Amino acid sequence: MKKEFMKKIYKSITLVATILSLSSCGNDWLDRKPADGIPSEDAITNYNDALTARTGMYDGIQGNSNSTSYYGARMFYYGDVRAEDMQARTQGMRSSSCYEMRYTVDDAPNMWNIPYNVVRRANRLIQAINEKKVTDATEAQIGKIYSEALVVRALVHFDLVRIYGMPYTADNGASLGVPVILKPLERNDLPSRNTVAEVYTQVIRDLTDAINSGYLAKDKTQGYINEWAAKALLTRVYLTKGDNENALKVAEDIITNSPYKLWTNEEYVAAWSKISGVHSNEMLFEIAITGSTDWTDREGIAYLYNEDGYADVIATKKFLDLLNEDPKDVRLGVFLAPTTKDFQKLYGTNTVFLNKYPADGLSDLRYNNVPLLRLSEVYLNAAEAAAKLGNQNDKAVKYLDAIVKRANPANTVQGTIVTVDRVLLERRKELIGEGHRFFDAMRNNETIVRYTSKEDQGWQQALKEEVRSFNRDFYKTLLPIPQNEIDANPAMKDQQNIGY
């Protein structure tokens, strides 16, 4: 299988031209330099160059103190504050635009350039290996880097299509998604938007190629993508696409065969610290931050969510009321009450601050790792997919019960019919602060209700009526394509999202 995979990757570059729609003018995003430690397009000529480019690719996912437009912070709070369980504070300057949904074509959170720059970095690695520029390493070493780059490319395209395209389940992927980019673009390359379905096809192809290659590590690899992380992403993709049979199948493979296990009830609160002895048990993939040269500093998600940082984002009263329905739910332990007088005046003793990104042994929360894929999500993916299949209630009960009983061993869903709504409720409780809720609601066509009157407003600020309660038909559930990209690319001239 591995040799067949290597033959395939050397041939795959010839397929690129059939996927891209190209024109002949300059493009704004192409003005960015690679910035991945490799100074030119021709510089990946040996294995050490490839390792350096690989590091740059992973660094791009995380970002740094000057660039948190992806998983450094924005991808998380984009999925949190646009729903009903987390909110920007009145003074939340960084997340308030997403929370209030007050963006326009000329003033919107930019989730375009940085992710596509990560695609560029992945494609440079893929192209160099396709062109046999890396020959001083074993087939396994080369195949591993190549496969990781495929997974990264899939991750970014999947995120982009969820941000700028309608949910696949809305119209079976017929609407416009984002450009599928499979090679480093030149200045005369101007891709148009592919359909949502075409993007998903490529994402699934990249993930399955990487998994089937046999080159991805099967053991735990902190800070790097392994086979189980790729499969965890694949089950998320299948679930979002509405392919519940495959979502369940892949999730069960991870649960049964991977070296990962759920944190116990006793471990749960402390396990969020990366220096706890059990932290890695659940973390299938996270960006490891080892020092101040590769951190997101005060612009990272840990600093934004913590009272000792910017305290930019807090839990809503609506969510805390939900979680407090069970006073023995262990997840209450990852929320903290204010300790400063100013915040106590605003929120009293309410535990509004999420502590899933705590300080490590250096007592500095800026060193906290950036988690992307966790085993609890895989269990909930399995439960949701099983519930949707209709004839798999035993499995829906099994996987949901693992999360419910972990939260409070006295609780169970045994002996019940597990509904999709019940799974989604548990997802809200378990995955808060990890960037999921908004996307969960969109793919399931749920209505997000933040508040409808002053009586249920809690401590949320006054919002325009249109963003107090909405579903995926509301045009601002999609971000606008940045206007400078539209202006620079004639191929996308008439492809702006509806409403903008």
Please place each PLM-identified region on the residue numbering:
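Bacterial Sec-dependent N-terminal signal peptides
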Residues: 1-4, 8, 18-48, 203, ...
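Short, surface-exposed recognition loops and adjoining beta-strand edges that mediate ligand/DNA contacts
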Residues: 41, 68-88, 160, 165-174, ...
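Inward-facing hydrophobic residues that define packing positions of alpha-helical scaffold repeats
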Residues: 54, 119-122, 200, 207, ...
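TPR-repeat structural position
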Residues: 200, 244, 392-393
